From Swiss-Prot:
Keywords: ATP-binding, Cytoplasm, Nucleotide-binding, Nucleotidyltransferase, Transferase, tRNA processing. This is Threonylcarbamoyl-AMP synthase. It is found in: Cytoplasm. The keyword Nucleotide-binding applies. The lineage of its organism: Bacteria, Pseudomonadati, Pseudomonadota, Gammaproteobacteria, Pseudomonadales. Residues 4-185 form the YrdC-like domain. Belongs to the SUA5 family. TsaC subfamily. Its main location: cytoplasm. It comes from Pseudomonas savastanoi pv. phaseolicola (strain 1448A / Race 6). Required for the formation of a threonylcarbamoyl group on adenosine at position 37 (t(6)A37) in tRNAs that read codons beginning with adenine. Catalyzes the conversion of L-threonine, HCO(3)(-)/CO(2) and ATP to give threonylcarbamoyl-AMP (TC-AMP) as the acyladenylate intermediate, with the release of diphosphate. It is an enzyme of class 2 (transferase). GO terms for molecular function: ATP binding; double-stranded RNA binding; L-threonylcarbamoyladenylate synthase; tRNA binding. The gene is tsaC. It catalyses: L-threonine + hydrogencarbonate + ATP = L-threonylcarbamoyladenylate + diphosphate + H2O.
Length: 185
């Protein structure tokens, strides 16, 4: 279990523009403040990930995404609520409410309410976070803190310790309108 003090320090660092690594349900993640354009572009550069691909936003509860849901059908809200918190990512229309550095070239944005206790505590303090697997493009996702440090030594601002959530696969990604699985979990 990670101490609350360490989570609070990570939250403070993120608010100051840091890119950090942290454990998630299945693999280590990299994250930053989604509203900090400079931090997001730095994260993309660290991973060698094109901005056009878009990024996932994670939160500790569905209310952190309410600003996106104003005109959503009840069916969509029910779909998300029935799978969260948990390893389910939904592609939802962003309605031009999010910047391109989050959405890439897509009409949708990927959202997930995490059930990892450390990451939930972090999101409760800072709000939604960018979350992407901790690996350079084309390399396997980090499953240990050691691998994170090997991949990103000197490039990221910190590592929030802790254990992975025990899942073997990343979250399933589904389209909210159709329910179609875009990536198996």
């Amino acid at each position: 279990m990670v101490s609350s003090w360490r989570v609070q320090q990570a939250a403070q660092d993120i608010r100051a523009g840091a890119v950090i690594a942290y454990p998630t349900e299945a693999v280590w993640g990299l994250g930053c403040d989604p509203w900090d354009e400079e931090a997001v572009y730095r994260l993309l550069a660290i991973k060698s990930r094109p901005v056009e691909k878009g990024l996932i936003l994670i939160a500790d509860n569905i209310r952190q995404f309410d600003f996106l849901f104003e005109d959503f059908p009840q069916l969509w809200l029910d779909r998300m609520a029935s799978t969260w918190p948990g390893p389910n990512t939904w592609l939802v229309p962003h309605q031009n409410l999010l910047p391109e550095w989050i959405t890439g070239i897509h009409e949708t944005v990927a959202l997930r309410v995490t059930d990892h206790p450390t990451v939930r505590e972090l999101c409760a303090l800072v709000g939604p976070l960018i979350s992407t697997s901790a690996n350079p493009a084309g390399r396997p996702a980090a499953r240990s803190r050691l691998r994170v440090e090997q991949y990103f030594r000197g490039q990221i601002d910190g590592v929030l310790g802790g254990s992975l959530g025990g899942r073997r696969n990343p979250s399933v990604i589904r389209d909210i309108a159709t329910g179609q699985v875009m990536r198996a979990g």
